[in-house]
Structures are given as C-alpha cells and as structure tokens.
Amino acid sequence: MRFDVNGFEIDKRQVSAEGADADPMAPLPLLVFSPGLYEVSVDTAISKTEGIKVLSDAPLANVPLDIQAEPTEKFIGVVQERVEDFLRGCATQRVLQPTGCPFGFSVQNRIDEPPVWSIVGQPTVQVVPNGASWAIPAADAVAHIEVDIRSLFDGSVREVSEDVPFTIDGTITVEPDGTASISIGGSANPAP
C-alpha cells in the first residue's frame, strides 16, 4: 500500500478515493507534472522493488505502470521463524492427530502411552506475492513419532519410531496497521 515516487512516500490509502478501504490491487491514478521523469519503487520492512522509471512527456497523457513487490529477506526470515514455532508447538501435543497441525499418525490398535512427536525436518519457507497479500507455497517437512502400539488381537506391544512426511502451505495477510497475520495449513503426505 506504500510506495515512493522520486523519494516521496505515498500511502495509497491516503490518496485513494476509497481511503482506508482502498483495494491494494486496484489502479491508482495520479496527476504528475509533465514533462517529467519519475521513479516509482517500494521499500518497506516486508516488501521491495527495484525503482522503475517512467517518462511523462505529454500533458494529460495516460502513462501506465505496474509494479509487483517482492518480499524482503527479513520478512521471509520472520515467516520462517513463525512457521518453525508453529510446528514445534504442534510437536508438543501428545496425541496421534495434533489439533490444527498438518501431520498425524493413524493406528488400528491401541496405544500404551501418549505419543512423543518431534520435528526432524523443518520446511524451507518461501513467500510469494498473492494478489493483495502473500502466500507460502507448498513446502515439505518431516515429523517423527515414537509410540508403543498394543495389538487388540494378541496384546503384544510394538514400538514405533517413524518419520512422518508432510507438506505445509499458507497465506499471509498484512493488516492496515502493518502487522502480518499468518495462516498455516498443509497435509500429511501419503505413505509410499
């Protein structure tokens, strides 16, 4: 929503007729002096672009410009950290199917004690533009479960220590106050 024109910061919500409800993806007409060379760029804590130069060389002429910002390394690092924190939180749940988490383990018998989860392979998170927000494309990760399973048939106990591959994805919405809301989803990968 914020961008620079020749070093002057503009917030789309301040110059758009819609104000705070401005659609980040909607075109924003601006009047400029002509002739003039203008450099438009984005440089915020979460996104950036290289400056794009545009020449306005005729009065009342429409000069279209489309810019797509990319996430900053710092923003990607924060998202990576939040995803890892989320998955570590999932691993603290001592159940076969951790609530709200992208991995789980199914058994046909009984378990003797609650399972112990760990994350042995964190995903490598990428952040990509997704319209007016950001997306986390699918990334592979691996959880590990240790649990004792008791057979309903003969009462024997089998110790299970198994890696559980899964995939995460997500969306990131930047609120008007500049905070980011990260929603993480995903699914268990089918067994080979």
What is each of the regions a protein language model found here?
Residues 1-192:
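Short loop/turn and low-complexity linker motifs enriched in small/turn-promoting residues
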